[in-house]
A protein has these predicted regions:
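Extracellular/periplasmic carbohydrate-active domains that bind, remodel
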Residues: 1-441
């Protein structure tokens, strides 16, 4: 039973020590935590270990403060996610109305939030919305979808088998000082309908994108499709070590709903600064791998008004260890620090330092523009989208350095990709173009 209630606040150290289900070196806290989140505006979780055997639900007007030595752990074998907000709606099949219910004013600050996992388990296996996998696009430890006013600060995510934190349909947010420890998929996975926010100081070990801004995404990776607007991302540092994936994804697209409506999953007004340890910024459309033709007709998306400042990238080897990149295939083996396979307008680079190994990989560049392909002939399987045609317009740069040398003419380090007929296909193969590249003084 909860005791010592004062002014809408509770310290969990006041909970009577009885009635808990034992687990390993501690106890199962699911009921007590959910009761506290539902009943009190402010909850303090002191240092200690808190095991959880089902999802924690956070309603509006809830502030959770956890001691830095508090560990809230989803126990092994639980298929559902660790924590989510209350008013989640699945927007996979139909557009969510603008006036759909949202939660408001949620904060989670401090603590270690983790799982007892040792590998990525796969979509629908861990991080589910519920036991029945009702919202199949949810695959995460934390989910915030349908929130106005969100704060996440000073958190550690540990051993997440799916995404560490999945975000969608959120307006007005601050995410700051987040560390990932041995997380096996994406770190921060941002989907559509997200606007007016700041992300600051992300670091650590993830085995897929450290941060993904996926306005368009696969059906097994999102329940929110739509624009990402007015976002600043500052202070991103990919960790080192075995299996760390050093990528930052920025993915727009045109998403088709079941009723025939289409969603412009654009990304506009984005500033990215103070980034290190990243190999590649993935700014291209990538649909699920397919044979013959993609499962859905996904349109090429648009990115407008994006700035990269104070970036340090090591692209001396491809981030994706596919055979065509490693072998230097002259047609499909091009890779770059900035890989564009979307329609990009108004992109600016300032104080960007890139390392390339042109001796080993002469097909490596500062930027590529155009389609990508990795075709596995014996399976007739395509991993990328070679039919993409796109353009990068109004590219401005200042103080760009490649292998320590100032780039006076960046156009020489931009590869325009154009595919002829790579293999038998009913789809036309794509091409890229770059328009108006100029150096600022």
């Amino acid at each position: 039973m909860l005791t010592n209630i004062k002014h809408g606040k509770i310290d969990l150290s006041c909970i009577a020590d009885g009635g808990f289900k034992p687990y390993k070196d501690g106890k199962i806290w699911s009921d007590e935590l959910n009761r506290a989140f539902k009943t009190y505006r402010e909850i303090f979780i002191p240092a200690g270990r808190y095991y959880v055997d089902r999802s924690l639900i956070v309603p509006s007007d809830t502030k959770i403060y956890a001691d830095e030595h508090a560990e809230i752990i989803l126990i092994k074998g639980v298929k559902t996610l660790l924590l989510r907000n209350e008013s989640v709606i699945d927007g996979s099949d139909y557009k969510i109305p603008d006036d759909a219910p949202c939660d408001e004013n949620i904060s989670v600050c401090g603590g270690v939030w983790g799982e007892e996992n040792e590998e990525r388990l796969g979509y629908g296996v861990s991080g589910r919305f519920d036991e029945n996998d009702t919202f199949h696009g949810v695959s995460t430890c934390f989910l915030f979808s349908g929130v106005r006013g969100l704060t996440l600060k000073n958190l550690v995510f540990r051993a997440a088998a799916g995404f560490a934190c999945q975000l969608g349909r959120t307006d007005g947010f601050t995410i700051e000082n987040i560390r990932f420890e041995n997380c096996f998929a994406d770190g921060l996975h941002v989907n559509g309908g997200v606007k007016n926010g700041t992300v600051k100081n992300l670091s650590g070990h993830t085995e897929d994108d450290l941060i993904a801004l996926n306005a368009y995404d696969w059906d097994n990776s999102s329940i929110n499709f739509g624009a990402i607007e007015n976002l600043t991302v500052e202070g991103v540092n990919c960790g080192d070590g075995q299996n760390v994936h050093k990528s930052f994804r920025i993915q727009p697209g045109i998403y088709p709903y079941k009723n025939g409506e289409k969603e412009d999953c654009r990304i506009t007004n984005l500033t990215v600064k103070n980034v290190s340890g990243v190999t590649t910024f993935k700014m291209y459309l990538q649909t699920p791998a397919y044979t013959d033709v993609p499962e859905k007709e996904i349109g090429v998306g648009r990115i407008e008004n994006v700035t990269f400042e104070h970036i340090s990238a090591d692209t001396t080897a491809p981030v994706d260890k596919q055979p065509n990149y490693l072998s230097g295939n002259p047609v499909t083996g091009n890779f770059a620090t900035f890989e564009i396979g979307s329609n990009v307008k108004n992109i600016r680079f300032s104080d960007v330092a890139v390392r390339l190994n042109k001796e080993k990989y002469p097909n490596s560049y500062f930027m590529t523009v155009g389609p990508k392909s990795q075709y596995i002939e014996e399976k007739h399987l395509e991993l990328f989208d070679p039919y993409v045609s796109c353009a990068a317009e109004n590219i401005r740069y200042k103080d760009v350095r490649i292998n320590g040398q100032i780039a006076d003419d960046l156009e020489k380090d931009i590869k325009i990709v154009e595919f002829g007929k790579l293999y038998p296909s009913s789809l036309p193969f794509g091409k890229g173009k770059a328009v108006c590249i100029r150096r600022e003084k």
